[in-house]
Amino acid sequence: MNDTPNDIQKPKQGKRFSERLPHWLRQALPKGSVFDFTDKTIKRTGMATVCEEALCPNRTRCWSRKTATYLALGDACSRRCGFCNIDFTKKPLPPDPDEPRKIAESAKILQLKHIVLTMVARDDLEDGGASCLVRIIDTLHKELPESTVEMLASDFQGNVDALHTLLDSGLTIYNHNVETVERLTPVVRHKATYRRSLFMLEQAALYLPDLKIKSGIMVGLGEQESEVKQTLKDLADHGVRIVTIGQYLRPSRLHIPVKSYVTPETFDYYRRVGESLGLFVYAGPFVRSSFNADIVLQDMENKQSKMAKT
């Protein structure tokens, strides 16, 4: 995947890393009554969100439009990935049996039409937590039957039975992030492998061919352009149809350092490369796998509808 279609122009290189953010990574942080309502709802129901635990830079923007991404199976992870701010523990607490009710209650109060769930990795559980996730999703389908559900799942350590258990729950979107290019995977997420992630994505596509399958990567970690293009090709070849690409921003000095700030023009370039492979790509400096997930789904469905009419 080293060749680039002639009609896709390459952008200028982005800035090398410094502590000072470039202008395209500075944003106003809107807060107001809607943000406060979302914040109070989440605190009242006692649910963890990846927005808070991962120090997501989009939290105020998302909560100001009454959306949030719920973090299932606790707020402490059995893995310690170099990019992630979620707490690590060698002995996670047992799953909360009341979690399905809490998430459903919060989603009903916020009137979510598209509910996004993610999870901490639970390598301590035999099925990686898949059966617990199904109970959450079943409750959401029961309490909010008109809402769609998107699940950003772990790799379940390659357990295909656990994957099938999750997929049988009636998801609208199954999401599993490869996070970075193959060369950097051992550094960025040392307990996962690039090929295992591709395998799980492909298994999902084979099991439910009509399911919308999504993955995402971060850039600015030291990857080469050719590696990003190869990753997009790998994702397309393994059944993925939606890809998110965003700038890596380290949560603290204890995390993997940023190697470069990727320009908006480069994100647009990667979007066009992905589209040339048949992917629906949502790319930009602040894009995260769950950012504007409802809008991404709607945009993809609108695009598919237009294509079907032509």
From Swiss-Prot:
Its EC number is 2.8.1.8. One of its GO terms (cellular component) is cytoplasm. Binds 2 [4Fe-4S] clusters per subunit. One cluster is coordinated with 3 cysteines and an exchangeable S-adenosyl-L-methionine. Pathway: Protein modification; protein lipoylation via endogenous pathway; protein N(6)-(lipoyl)lysine from octanoyl-[acyl-carrier-protein]: step 2/2. Pfam families: Radical_SAM (PF04055). Residues 63-280 form the Radical SAM core domain. Keywords: 4Fe-4S, Cytoplasm, Iron, Iron-sulfur, Metal-binding, S-adenosyl-L-methionine, Transferase. Its cofactor is [4Fe-4S] cluster. [4Fe-4S] cluster 1 binds at C51, C56, C62, S290. One of its GO terms (molecular function) is metal ion binding. [4Fe-4S] cluster 2 binds at C77, C81, C84. It catalyses: [[Fe-S] cluster scaffold protein carrying a second [4Fe-4S](2+) cluster] + N(6)-octanoyl-L-lysyl-[protein] + 2 oxidized [2Fe-2S]-[ferredoxin] + 2 S-adenosyl-L-methionine + 4 H(+) = [[Fe-S] cluster scaffold protein] + N(6)-[(R)-dihydrolipoyl]-L-lysyl-[protein] + 4 Fe(3+) + 2 hydrogen sulfide + 2 5'-deoxyadenosine + 2 L-methionine + 2 reduced [2Fe-2S]-[ferredoxin]. It is found in: Cytoplasm. Belongs to the radical SAM superfamily. Lipoyl synthase family. This is Lipoyl synthase. It comes from Chlamydia abortus (strain DSM 27085 / S26/3).
